[in-house]
Amino acid sequence: DEFQRHKIGSPFETLPRGTRAILTGDFNCLPNDDAIKLLQTPCANGAPGYVDAWPLAHPHTPNAHTVDLHDATKAPRCFDFVFVSDNLGTHVRALTVNAETAASDHQPLLLEVEL
């Protein structure tokens, strides 16, 4: 139909692609929340879900705290994530959290991939 035709080739196209993708940000939820699980779930059209890069870089280690590290009134948590497309998973070499800076209530993350 007309609506679907305009979606093809646009940023909103939902067809599976062979491209690599990295998705980062402050998701304001914990690693086991439903919103995170949804990002990791394959799409109905066959496109794979995203992969959390933290366990790829740090197997068997819980996600590092990324928020409220420098606020003594709050408990540190992990709200910031780096996700990669499944075809980038084997290329993840490191993921680090800069715990030193207090420029924000969220800590910066640095992903290293080898292509």
Where are these regions (language model features)?
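Active-site regions of metal-assisted phosphoester/phosphodiester hydrolases
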Residues: 1-115
